[in-house]
Amino acid sequence: IQIQPNYAMAHNNLGITFLELGEKRKAKSSFEKAIKIQPNYAHAYWNLHSLANDIDEALTILKKLYEFDNKYIKAKLMISALKAFKGKFEDFDTLIRSSESNHPMTRSIKWVFSLPKIPKIFFNRWDFFDAIVAQTDKTRPFYEFGVWNGISFKHLIKTFKKGFGFDTFTGIPEDWHNEPSGTYSSFGSVPKIKGGEFIVGKFENTLPKFFSQKRPLASLINFDADLYSSTLCALNYSNNVIDEKSILIFDELITNKNWEKDEYKALNEFCDSLSISYDVIAVSFYSKQVAIKLKK
């Protein structure tokens, strides 16, 4: 940006980085700068909608995008979803009979609207986290399976003061569709975060020992292991710290190309094995997060 201050893509990418770090104001400023430089920059509009305060604001941004780029499929799908959240299902009904009916976002939207109770929708991970945290028992610690560089952990520890994090810190232990093993590595660097206790290693090696001792009930558990196998392992071993007050967040449960084969599959197999169910309380199509409460 210093070399080319009017390079719209650079401002958009900077906004994505700020958003990943939780710097929402800076992210919004960067997306708006990209749009000012290049008014028909669809990706910047798409990212900007993630910072909307409500459905109406998100719809306004996405409709602007779709006016100049009606081939931006994600915008079309999100518009239909947001209208459905407002009780207007015409676009959604058309969508599920269209050529986009098997798009991963369409499948995600269909799943959400098949639920007994429609959950609340959020547009970015930080607003999602804050809304869920507000519903938790803050006297309890939180658990996170998949820490990576600790950005989410740092955000959560501000509220709970004590957290347990589990990760290899050398990346995912097996291939995840098109992502090779070792992706999302922090190169062995374990975060140093006050109040954080980090258990290093593969889940199948560390969780049996950790949970062989009585552990405090969870306020919140953030499942960010991506893999079906790792998520199922984490669910099985953390079951004893989950009760009716615990809220479970799955970081990438929906909208990925193969979402039904990953965290979603692990959650449903776990519940089926125990003959229990769950209530979905929040979703974010943009950040892919889903929050649930188990019905034990």
Regions from the PLM with identified roles:
Residues 7, 41, 71-72:
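Residue-level recognition of tetratricopeptide repeat
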Residues 21, 52-55, 86:
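Structural motif corresponding to the intra-repeat A-B loop/turn of tetratricopeptide repeats
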